[in-house]
Amino acid sequence: MSQTAIEGEYYFRKMEIASGFNFSKDGKFQFFYVYGSVDRNAAGSFTVEGDTLKLKSDKEPGKDFTITNQSKNGSGYTVQFIHPNKYVLKHILCTFVADGKEQQEFTDEDGQVHVDIPHCDTIYALHTLYPDIPTIVKDDKNNNNHFTLELKPSLEQVSFKDIIFKIIDGKTIECINNYFMDATDIKFIKQ
């Protein structure tokens, strides 16, 4: 199947959700998603392999936050997020991995999470309003235990990393696996 077979606009609509793609002849796409107070977007390129549609967003996956400060101070592990809009600070999930075991904690109203654990190999951060590939805050080579991070403007974009789309026919594209939309049975229909 050639790329031109999916050229045009495809939409998914469900109660409170509107989403769509615009695929162009030159292998580029634009995407939007609106759900309640959350708006997301993406742009990039696409390829078609058989009945599989592969998207490559301009957004780099796993880079939703920037570490602005890190240090070794006291005990436990503290991650502080900063952003002018306090509403977005309380929806960040941090995953602390120690010896293969995970502990997940949400940030408080001020964008902070603290865990009293003696050792942590890896820390990941994921914004639950804008889910995408988690950002690595700390790896096993980093001995720091206090981190300050800023939310990047690209947070609202979708990377589409590891997302599989199947071309059902000339008018339907189905999202097989999904981490970025609060919906199931996602089928984009050509308009």
PLM region spans:
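Lipid interaction determinants
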Residues: 1-191
